[in-house]
Amino acid sequence: MDNLVLCEANNVPLTPITFLKRASECYPNRTSIIYGQTRFTWPQTYDRCCRLAASLLSLNITRNDVVSILAPNVPAMYEMHFSVPMTGAVLNPINTRLDAKTIAIILRHAEPKILFVDYEFAPLIQEVLRLIPTYQSQPHPRIILINEIDSTTKPFSKELDYEGLIRKGEPTPSSSASMFRVHNEHDPISLNYTSGTTADPKGVVISHQGAYLSALSSIIGWEMGIFPVYLWTLPMFHCNGWTHTWSVAARGGTNVCIRHVTAPEIYKNIELHGVTHMSCVPTVFRFLLEGSRTDQSPKSSPVQVLTGGSSPPAVLIKKVEQLGFHVMHGYGLTEATGPVLFCEWQDEWNKLPEHQQIELQQRQGVRNLTLADVDVKNTKTLESVPRDGKTMGEIVIKGSSLMKGYLKNPKATSEAFKHGWLNTGDIGVIHPDGYVEIKDRSKDIIISGGENISSIEVEKVLYMYQEVLEAAVVAMPHPLWGETPCAFVVLKKGEEGLVTSEGDLIKYCRENMPHFMCPKKVVFFQELPKNSNGKILKSKLRDIAKALVVREDDAGSKKVHQRSIEHVSSRL
């Protein structure tokens, strides 16, 4: 059989952009997007994406060019997950929580030709563009403003606007034919940044094949069914909305887009549109629980929720499910192109007491259908740990859905893929039934509201402060976000009590990094605990931090039901 060959008929590259064309042909009467009063069908969304792709081609966007976007969960953000890769270009969704300096670092590193900006972030981008020349002399990306669909607001001077590109786009027969013909399924489809706060940010390059496989595995692992109504509470900028941007199209579902995610908005849209699915981190559960009683109306059928990040406490899962939600726990990371583990329900669990069922739901689960393998290995011997639910090791994975690597960072790519696995840096166990459960994060990661914060990055900023001699940052409990940074600092001799206070350092951090990364507490020590090799013992500092409490006014718990949470995303 070796003489059989691959040809154009039996070797078509895998890409999720084909889901869009299929949806337009198979579900012509299904609503694809709901956004306020705006409604689109799948044929209309297909037409809009084709027109935008044609306009991008007319602007000389070609294969492997980067096109960035800074926008909330609005229709444009969804459409660009198809229209940009239809041209062969690479989509770069940017975290809307970041400050101007961090976004400038990302743009310098990604070098996009075009930057789409939602009107809400136009002032921020003006500041970003002023910062870019201080890093290197490179042309600014062309700015294209995204207004509301029915807006009459004028774009930036001499620049185009998003809806204008769609109106002007005229796909030709040749361009239309090429839009769905990916050159190679290993070509990049998206560039997602795990961190943009250092001089060496990690831009994760995702392939068409990886996105295709991840989207399908989510459909199967989450049991999405046909025609899901998906509420966008998870930011699309985070790992392409865990690839649900493509999954919903594959099932001919409906995307319910909301600009600002609050508890009242969630409940309102669930009731208005019959939402069946949504994704979020456990932090969002607290918003839902603390919403007004009038918002928490009974659901005609359970809303399926896929959650990730820190493991939600059993009591939290129980309370959320009493509101009409059914929770499935998952695990993934940007480097894995979204979820790779799902806590799939087993029939025998139905016979267990409720508290045992919820305890089982807390686990991260078993590998998805398209992941080749997952294991937990001893970090020293590299041997698999016993499946006893007690012996901890590093979670490692392998499969065709994983990232291609880190952009312009071969050293980090090699380190991530050493020993033939993707090394997640997360510590966990495997239970006798094969289910994986995370027990700890790698030492320098703090999980705050689902966002990954590197303690090393926070420490770098603290060390920039003139009076700081030593600094170590660990996680401390936070009543709203789960964890938040806590800094332990040693001041230079003779500086104690003179000019530097806890407030001074917190203020300095807020001026030099994204606010969500800033320490909520600073503890001054005469000397930090160290081992015999002079290494700071963060384990001891974590024990101290566990006893610390964030003040209620810092937590914002009294206003939690009003606070916008669209920025909450997760390393699953």
UniProtKB/Swiss-Prot annotation:
Principal EC category: ligase
Family the entry assigns: Belongs to the ATP-dependent AMP-binding enzyme family.
Entry annotated with the keyword Methyltransferase: no
Keyword Ligase belongs to the record: yes
GO terms classed as biological process: butyrate metabolic process
Protein name: Butyrate--CoA ligase AAE11, peroxisomal
Tissue: Expressed in flowers.
CDD domains in the cross-refs: ttLC_FACS_AEE21_like
Role: Butyrate--CoA ligase that is active in vitro with medium-chain fatty acids, with a preference for hexanoate and octanoate.
Subcellular location: Peroxisome
Domain of life per record: Eukaryota
Endpoints of the signal sequence: none
Keywords (A to Z) from UniProt: Fatty acid metabolism, Ligase, Lipid metabolism, Peroxisome
